[in-house]
């Protein structure tokens, strides 16, 4: 019986990255032997055991055979006669197929160390194409390690392109697809994840709403990058540089889906695209089982980002209606999220990457003033029932109007 540290822990150690989880592989043991040593079996589909003290996972060496569609269409064979190399052969990428024995020696039958040094994401064997989830995993690794200079090996990209043309991708469950998306949204370069999926052809299969944005033009005056798909990737990149909140990043990703619905004869204009995108976002979120928190913010950003951009032109009544509709009174954190997404939208354009966004300070000032209106004072003044709400609304409009005047005066003083 031999125990090896495998997978991400070995890879990340070689990359001098912090190690989050350790996975171990056991060669030459049976489930009965593991249980006699105090390990507790937890794996249903294949033998995985928890260490009696550390609770870390130890999996028996195994091989896999394709028996059906999808990432779950495999039968596993775990036996004491399965070798280290046979187990590593079933893994996705060479950089994930390196093992370390208990003496610290590295076992690298598929040259993963060389690929780490060359910054290459390369598949281990042709069996890579049997698991459609690997298309998403490689895209996620490309995004995760983009800052380290990793690229997908040409032969691996060719395999991913072939896989995207088969029915395998459609066999993936929404939960597994979203799991990979969510992990990518939490990484440093989520835009790379979607760029890779587009490059291999998986984007139009799994996320047709996003793929449809590429090739849709926007007015060059406001969007020097012109292409809506490119703009969307730039906005997503901007959002990830500003916040780690995955809900904001998701909202940035889908804020312009309505532009794909604009009639070609109206291009490059996209009137009402924010509202047109609402049913598209709802459909996408329902299909992928997107969490309600993400969906609700995405709908808000799509619906209101044009209003936020035009904040200085909005009447005070319209600003209060925006606050009411978004329920900022009970969820003030959503205003911050909305503004972050709008800043990302504004800066996600060629040449505008460092542009100031005074609309954010202005709307924050409006909300602070409106939220400080004292309801108790209104009640004390004798208002009752529905009159209280009307008086509160009028007072909020009044204080926002004052903020508006103060802002205009301060801007006038700054203008030479």
From Swiss-Prot:
Positions of CTP binding: 8, 11, 91, 137, 140
Any GO BP: RNA repair
Cofactor detail note: Magnesium is required for nucleotidyltransferase activity.
Pfam family name, one: PolyA_pol_RNAbd
Reactions listed under catalytic activity: a tRNA precursor + 2 CTP + ATP = a tRNA with a 3' CCA end + 3 diphosphate; a tRNA with a 3' CCA end + 2 CTP + ATP = a tRNA with a 3' CCACCA end + 3 diphosphate
Cofactor(s) the protein requires to work: Mg(2+); Ni(2+)
Entry EC no(s): 2.7.7.72, 3.1.3.-, 3.1.4.-
Signal peptide residues on this chain, from the entry's feature table: none
InterPro entries per UniProt: CCA_bact (IPR012006), HD/PDEase_dom (IPR003607), HD_domain (IPR006674), NT_sf (IPR043519), PolA_pol_head_dom (IPR002646), PolyA_RNA-bd (IPR032828), tRNA_CCA-adding_enzyme (IPR050124)
Sites where the protein binds Mg(2+): 21, 23
GO molecular function terms noted in the UniProt entry: ATP binding; CCA tRNA nucleotidyltransferase activity; cyclic-nucleotide phosphodiesterase activity; magnesium ion binding; phosphatase activity; tRNA binding
Superkingdom as given in the UniProt entry: Bacteria
Keyword terms of this UniProt record: ATP-binding, Hydrolase, Magnesium, Metal-binding, Multifunctional enzyme, Nickel, Nucleotide-binding, Nucleotidyltransferase, RNA repair, RNA-binding, Transferase, tRNA processing
Domain HD, first and last residues per copy: 228-329
Other information: A single active site specifically recognizes both ATP and CTP and is responsible for their addition.
Oligomer status and interactors: Monomer. Can also form homodimers and oligomers.
Protein's UniProt name: Multifunctional CCA protein
Originating species: Shewanella sp. (strain MR-7)
């Amino acid at each position: 019986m031999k125990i090896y540290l495998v997978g991400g822990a070995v890879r990340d150690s070689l990359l001098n990255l912090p190690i989050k989880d350790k996975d171990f592989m056991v060669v030459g043991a049976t489930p009965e032997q593991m249980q006699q040593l105090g390990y507790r079996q937890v794996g249903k589909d294949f033998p995985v055991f928890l260490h009696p003290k550390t609770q870390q996972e130890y999996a028996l060496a195994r091989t896999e055979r394709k028996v059906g569609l999808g990432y779950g269409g495999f039968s596993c064979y775990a036996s004491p006669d399965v070798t280290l190399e046979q187990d590593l052969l079933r893994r996705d990428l060479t950089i994930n197929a390196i093992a370390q024995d208990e003496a610290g020696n590295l076992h690298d039958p598929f040259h993963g160390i060389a690929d780490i040094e060359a910054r290459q994401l390369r598949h281990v064997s042709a069996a890579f194409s049997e698991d459609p989830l690997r298309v998403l995993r490689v895209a996620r690794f490309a995004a995760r390690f983009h800052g380290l200079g990793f690229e997908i090996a040409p032969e691996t990209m060719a395999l991913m392109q072939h896989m995207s043309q088969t029915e395998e991708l459609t066999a993936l469950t929404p939960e597994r697809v979203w799991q990979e998306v969510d992990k990518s949204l939490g990484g440093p370069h989520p835009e790379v994840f979607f760029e890779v999926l587009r490059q291999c052809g998986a984007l139009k299969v799994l996320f047709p709403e996003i793929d449809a944005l590429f090739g849709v033009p926007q007015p060059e005056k406001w969007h020097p990058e012109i292409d809506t798909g490119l703009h969307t990737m730039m906005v997503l990149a901007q959002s990830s540089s500003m916040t780690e909140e995955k809900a904001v990043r998701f909202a940035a990703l889908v804020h312009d889906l309505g532009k794909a619905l604009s009639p070609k004869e109206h291009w490059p204009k996209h009137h009402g695209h924010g509202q047109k995108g609402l049913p598209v976002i709802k459909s996408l979120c329902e299909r992928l089982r997107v969490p309600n928190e993400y969906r609700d913010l995405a709908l808000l950003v799509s619906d209101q980002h044009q209003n936020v951009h035009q904040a200085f032109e909005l009447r005070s009544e319209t600003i209060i209606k925006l606050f009411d509709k978004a329920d900022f009174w009970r969820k003030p954190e959503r205003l911050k999220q909305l503004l972050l997404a709008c800043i990302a939208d504004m800066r996600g354009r060629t040449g505008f990457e460092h542009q100031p966004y005074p609309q954010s300070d202005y709307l924050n000032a409006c909300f602070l003033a409106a939220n400080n209106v004292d309801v108790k004072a209104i009640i004390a003044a004798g208002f009752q029932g529905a009159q209280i709400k009307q008086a509160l609304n009028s007072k909020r409009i009044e204080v926002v109007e004052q903020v508006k005047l103060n802002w205009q005066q301060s801007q006038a003083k700054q203008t030479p």
